[in-house]
Regions:
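Extended beta-strand-rich architecture
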Residues: 1-267
């Protein structure tokens, strides 16, 4: 009846306004007309409900804890491109048969240097350390929380695990300094009693080839490998034109979170 009074034709869910009502353009305009005819005083008043405060997901909380802990040990955050050059794999001496060389290729890249999605965050960190060294920064300690892109099948999207990568050089930088920083980060994140095993041919990370064989280690939480750390191999260091000993670490955030003890108990 209200629509007839307003000379609005109704056909199912479609309303056709008369030609002289150019002000009726969208559903809100029709609702306003119906409310006006029905009477605003006849519409019951309701109290506006408050919007619930948003909260972080467990993954976001864990990532924030890691980031805060990394900043607390003296690292500065960086943000690098997720796409790299295939030549970066040669610079870190990655084996020719490594699965990390199987990448997601970008169909319209900006250039050869950004033509594939990275399967490891290590080259991005080393490129940034190299840039800082060339700009004569005497000592740096950097970190990045970023994704790697690991292909699964031709018709499926790649996996996108989160990684925490740390890189440093300078007079105060050495293997044990980096190890102490990583231990502090892990303890703060709720991963206690982690163990370190010297890198060997059976190391579960292909990037180990970029590290000095006698000054590197794989990090374990129980039986699960959660990362690695060590001094960059002299050959790789030379590939990046870094003229001083350089140290890197990578932690697997997605693998770490289920193992972390995030609940605090008091005795």
């Amino acid at each position: 009846d209200t629509m007839k009074m307003l000379e609005i034709e109704v056909d199912g869910d479609t309303c056709i306004s008369p030609s002289f009502r150019i002000d009726l353009e969208r559903p809100a305009d029709l609702a306003e007309e119906v409310a006006r005819i029905y009477g605003y005083n006849n519409i019951p008043s309701t109290v506006i409900k408050g919007i619930a405060n948003a909260s972080l997901t467990p993954k976001q909380k864990f990532r924030r804890t890691l980031e805060n802990a990394t900043v607390a040990v003296g690292c500065y955050g960086i943000l690098t491109y997720s796409f790299i050059s295939p030549k970066y794999f040669d610079k870190i001496a990655l084996p020719a048969d490594s699965s990390l060389r199987k990448t997601v290729v970008i169909s319209n890249p900006l250039g050869e240097d950004t033509s594939v999605m990275r399967t490891t965050t290590l080259p991005s960190m080393l490129e940034t350390l190299s840039l800082n060294y060339k700009n004569r920064n005497a000592a740096v300690a950097l970190y990045e929380i970023g994704k790697e892109y690991l292909p699964t099948a031709p018709d499926k999207l790649p996996e996108e695990p989160d990684r925490l990568t740390i890189g440093m050089y300078g007079d105060d930088a050495d293997f044990f300094t980096l190890k102490g920083m990583v231990e502090t980060i892990l303890e703060t994140a709720g991963l206690h009693d982690c163990t370190y095993k010297a890198c060997g041919t059976d190391a579960p990370f292909d990037e180990i080839c970029a590290l000095h064989p006698g000054r590197s280690a794989v990090i374990y939480a129980g039986e699960t490998p959660i990362g690695y750390l060590g001094e960059v191999h002299p050959t790789v260091q030379k590939n990046y034109d870094i003229g001083t000993r350089t140290y890197v670490a990578k932690l697997l955030i997605d693998e770490m979170q289920p193992l972390a003890q995030t609940e605090i108990t008091y005795q």
